[in-house]
Amino acid sequence: MTTIEQLEKHFKIRRNASSIMIKENNAEIFTEEQIKEIMQYCVAEAEKEEIENLHFEISSKSPNYDVYKKYLETYSFEYVTENMIVCKDIYEVEDVESEIDFKLIEEVGEDTFYSLWNEMTEEQVTYDQFVNMMLQEIGEQWKEHCLTASVGEEPIGIVIPHIEKGALEEGKLMYFAVAPNMRNKGYETAFFIGAMFVLKEIGASYYIGEINVQNEWMKDVFEKNGCQLLSSTERYVRKF
């Protein structure tokens, strides 16, 4: 198997105008030589594309952890942060009555959804970059997964529930964001449960979530909704 084939099969790759994120996607065991070739290839591609930052994310439970660490140092990557991975069984999640109203992107309009997404996630990307991210992560049907949440006429958040590519029953929330002025007003739990029910409706039996270890707000949401800690990941970056 070529280096690019290994990357496409065993890693999740996300690109935007200034960076590439390469994330370990399973527990495949590689030889040291294979990992060296993967690192060399990624650095060479980043230099060729003249991007600013190359990110690499590895699991703390990876069978290749020590070798990854060795070659991340060899190729001048610097440690950035740690994320925690949680899991929730959603077989028994039920639709509960709530004042939160979910609407699809076709009901609110693409411009409105994109504006809310920018405001609530604070990610500085163009609309074309946003669409490209959706296509990479979800595919051509991405619009069917983009939801706004409102109470009355007041938008409180956006969420993008979907089934992980290559996994039949693994539910993900590409984004779960609440407007800063609507946080800590008692909406988070009902919003999260509503998102879990949507995942169940589209075929997920469990949810896997990932957040930065310093994100106390989202950690609190996970804890209140019975999510269990699975593992952690470490993120490294090489700047060009």
Residues of each region from the PLM?
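Conserved donor-binding loop and adjoining core beta-sheet/short helix segment
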Residues: 1-51, 55-60, 159-180
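A conserved beta-strand-loop-helix scaffold within acyl/acetyltransferase catalytic domains
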Residues: 13, 127-178
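Conserved acetyl-CoA-binding loop-helix of GNAT-fold acetyltransferases
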Residues: 32-44, 178, 184-201, 220-224
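Acyl-donor-binding surface of acyltransferase catalytic domains
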Residues: 34-99, 233-238
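Short acidic/polar active-site loop segments enriched in Thr and Asp
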Residues: 52, 205, 228
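Conserved active-site tyrosine of GNAT-family acetyltransferases
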Residues: 68-72, 221-223, 227
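Short amphipathic alpha-helix that is part of the acyltransferase structural core
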Residues: 96-128
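Long, contiguous binding/interaction regions
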Residues: 210
